[in-house]
Amino acid sequence: MAIKTESFILNIGPQHPSTHGVFRLRLILDGEVITDLEPVFGYLHRGIEKLAEGRTYLQDIPFTDRLDYLGSMTNNHAYVMAVEKLAGITVPERAEYIRVILDELQRIASHLAGLGFFLNDLGALQTPLLYMFREREKIVELFDMCSGQRLNYNYYRFGGFVQDLPEEFLPALKKLLDTLPGFIDEYEQLISTNEIVLIRTKGVGVLKRELAINSSAAGPVLRASGVNWDIRRNDPYSIYDRFEFDIPTAQNGDTYDRYMVRIREMRQSVRILRQAVKDLPEGEIMGKAPKLLKPPAGEVYSRIEGPKGELGFYLVSDGTDKPYRWRVRPPCLLNLSALKDMVVGWKVADLMAIFGSIDIVMGEVDR
């Protein structure tokens, strides 16, 4: 006699420690195997894009801090770069170098947080997270030196920065760059060959190259699937074309490769930082920008390579001091759209390992 079975619907979230935000997953299971997945988001929607259209261009900078709040510096950069392009504002040489320095520090800090939480989700409770937050804290202290904030920095301005780097910033940064590669080696010794990590991640949650491209995956998620695409190299912005660095990629597209790409990216960020500190010129940190900015009527799209992937801003100006349209292209939302392709066919026990490997921040997804 055949046994009659039925699919089981499992809801995870919207309050769940491994979703790292208010997010719900609706799973359909056959036993323990995931046969379908529906991501349900919007719980953190704040209407940022519409709010931004009712404020001046300058007043909108703090909104960008609150998208991916673990990547605020790069968010600031993407937005001010779009406005500068729209208004024809030139950025001084020193300010461009400082932007590269802050962007790469933010990339390292974001990867440290993402990897720490990912390993926490795997079951390595607290220890790897605290190891990585030990170094992230040093970067947060650098951001605090220049902006006065440990989160939501609001440091970038159209044409440069609100103020120059303090005297103690560069010595502290050089000290960090001397020690950070050794700590990355330590992470690899503890994690990259750990048998439990290998069992939980190798070959798990594979996102094939074609699916990664078709789903518009971005950043480490895309590069782990064998796609060599990085805005810093493929469409250079700021002064990234002056630096020597490699674009880490992998071929398997699994959970382990997404982890390894981020580890290697931190090493390349250190490489860029050393060049930027060595070549940092003296001079002005603020270009000529009007106090009340009214860009000429027109539209612009500007993009950068943030820690999570390609972050873009589309702006439409009607000639007033407020944007007519203010649109964000968030990499976290695009990476989340590929989650179903990664998890179908895997057991529910593997879900959080796969989900943690794409490093989602819901503030950017819901906006």
Curated annotation (Swiss-Prot):
InterPro entries: NADH_Q_OxRdtase_suD (IPR001135), NADH_UbQ_OxRdtase_49kDa_CS (IPR014029), NDH1_su_D/H (IPR022885), NiFe-Hase_large (IPR029014). One of its GO terms (molecular function) is NAD binding. It is found in: Cell membrane. PROSITE patterns: COMPLEX1_49K (PS00535). It holds the Pfam family Complex1_49kDa. It is an enzyme of class 7 (translocase). Its EC number is 7.1.1.-. It is a peripheral membrane protein. Keywords: Cell membrane, Membrane, NAD, Quinone, Translocase, Transport, Ubiquinone. It catalyses: a quinone + NADH + 5 H(+)(in) = a quinol + NAD(+) + 4 H(+)(out). One of its GO terms (cellular component) is plasma membrane. NDH-1 is composed of 14 different subunits. Subunits NuoB, C, D, E, F, and G constitute the peripheral sector of the complex. NDH-1 shuttles electrons from NADH, via FMN and iron-sulfur (Fe-S) centers, to quinones in the respiratory chain. The immediate electron acceptor for the enzyme in this species is believed to be ubiquinone. Couples the redox reaction to proton translocation (for every two electrons transferred, four hydrogen ions are translocated across the cytoplasmic membrane), and thus conserves the redox energy in a proton gradient. Belongs to the complex I 49 kDa subunit family. This is NADH-quinone oxidoreductase subunit D. It comes from Dehalococcoides mccartyi (strain ATCC BAA-2266 / KCTC 15142 / 195).
